[in-house]
UniProtKB/Swiss-Prot annotation:
Description of how the protein assembles with itself and partners: Binds to the N-terminal domain of the chaperone ClpA.
Family, similarity comment: Belongs to the ClpS family.
Top-rank taxon: Bacteria
GO biological process, one term: protein catabolic process
InterPro entries associated with the record: ClpS, ClpS_core, Ribosomal_bL12_C/ClpS-like
Function: Involved in the modulation of the specificity of the ClpAP-mediated ATP-dependent protein degradation.
UniProt cross-references to NCBIfam families, sorted A to Z: PRK00033.1-5
The protein, known as: ATP-dependent Clp protease adapter protein ClpS
Pfam families: ClpS
């Protein structure tokens, strides 16, 4: 907090400093389906989430076994962009892969 004297009438003003809070974070989650090939899911995780093959395979297996797998945690705008990119790529390739974002 800073104290600033007012030159007109001698009163003192206090400036409240804004406390910045970190941005909300969102998980990008792939959802399982019975049609998208496992290898396609691995490729998506590698390409859009910058994971190595082993990590991408682990995410794919989690999606396959548990119905969902977290690919990463990002700010809202980045998470939204990644969801859109993944869904668009999947549709262009003819796969029904679903990708969603959830508050972390």
């Amino acid at each position: 907090m800073a104290i600033i004297p007012d030159k007109q009438d001698g009163t003192v003003l206090e400036r409240q400093e804004k406390k910045l809070k970190p941005p909300s974070m969102y998980k990008v989650v792939l959802l399982n389906d019975d049609f998208t090939p496992m290898e396609f899911v691995v490729m998506i995780v590698q390409e859009y989430f910058n994971k190595d093959r082993e990590t991408a395979t682990q995410v794919m297996l989690k999606v396959h076994r548990e119905g969902r797998g977290v690919c990463g945690v990002y700010t809202r705008d980045i998470a939204s962009t990644k969801v859109e990119q993944v869904v668009t790529h999947a549709r262009q390739a003819g796969h029904p892969l679903q990708c969603v974002m959830e508050e972390a």
